[in-house]
Amino acid sequence: MDTTTVLDKYTQDLSNLPLEVKHLLQELKNKDVQLQEARKRYQTKDNQIHKFIRANGTLTKHPKEQQIYNKVEEDMVLVKKLQKEKILLANTALFLVSKHLSNFETDIAKLEKDELLPPVDNVMELDTPSSDMNSVINGLSDNLSGTTTPRGHSASTPVADNAANSMLRKAQKRKHALGMKGASGLTRPSKRMKSEDFEDKKYDNDSLSRPNEGPGNNGEDADNNLYCFCQRVSFGEMIGCDNDDCKFEWFHWSCVGITAPPKDDEIWYCPDCAPKMEKRKKKRK
């Protein structure tokens, strides 16, 4: 596997991603429209009751009060259901992007290990943005225009390799800027934890913008590992997935739609692992 192969692979893999994300966002928008309509309905009905009380006093019961409140309750249940579906759709879109990014970073690490791509720390910042862009354009223009460049027995051209190296280096820089999640060594004493229990340290909102130093340079009291579908540092309430092979392990409550802690003996799987564990459970039966 060389840099050109990796670039071609992910150009192909990502070809459908924009349409998939667009579809999920459209579904999310449709759910939001339904939610707003349901909310408007129960607020209108509730206002009817209050208007009647103001006109007739609290002792006089509205002739359709129970019927109205039943409709209000139905719409409130629907709003809660739609909100959970919106969260799931948003997390699915986030997971799709995170999955491709994680696979890309894994292949970059392999290229670095095989010395086919220089580590980001050793990349000299001599290339200007224009030269980087020109190398990418020159390397991909043949494919985009439907023409080919003679290669003889060579597996890839220098121009294509330069283009691939350029794009992969940029991906490397982005990976290090975000602070790629390393081996955290975390055990799971409890499925629910506050951020201060999670790491005895609070993080500012701008922590994502600060470059993450490599392993061993962070110090023992600093942890910039990224968790959850959102790939952010720990904060607030966290919950751990009970699947030992879970890719993300820990999740923010708000990202998975949790509002109350599960019981100590309750098994909880993240939205990504839940379908897999359900299939595994059915196979055992």
UniProtKB/Swiss-Prot annotation:
One of its GO terms (molecular function) is histone acetyltransferase activity. Residues 138-218 are annotated as: Disordered. Keywords: Cell cycle, Chromatin regulator, Coiled coil, DNA damage, DNA repair, Meiosis, Metal-binding, Nucleus, Zinc, Zinc-finger. The PHD-type zinc finger mediates the binding to H3K4me3. Belongs to the ING family. It holds the Pfam family ING. This is Chromatin modification-related protein YNG2. It comes from Debaryomyces hansenii (strain ATCC 36239 / CBS 767 / BCRC 21394 / JCM 1990 / NBRC 0083 / IGC 2968). Zn(2+) 2 binds at residues 241, 246, 270, 273. Gene3D superfamilies: 6.10.140.1740, Zinc/RING finger domain, C3HC4 (zinc finger) (3.30.40.10). InterPro entries: ING_fam (IPR028651), ING_N_histone-binding (IPR024610), Zinc_finger_PHD-type_CS (IPR019786), Znf_FYVE_PHD (IPR011011), Znf_PHD (IPR001965), Znf_PHD-finger (IPR019787), Znf_RING/FYVE/PHD (IPR013083). Residues 19-54 form a coiled coil. The keyword DNA repair applies. Component of the NuA4 histone acetyltransferase complex which is involved in transcriptional activation of selected genes principally by acetylation of nucleosomal histone H4 and H2A. The NuA4 complex is also involved in DNA repair. Involved in cell cycle progression and meiosis. It is found in: Nucleus. Residues 138-165 have a biased composition (Polar residues). The record marks 227, 238, 242, 250 as: Histone H3K4me3 binding.
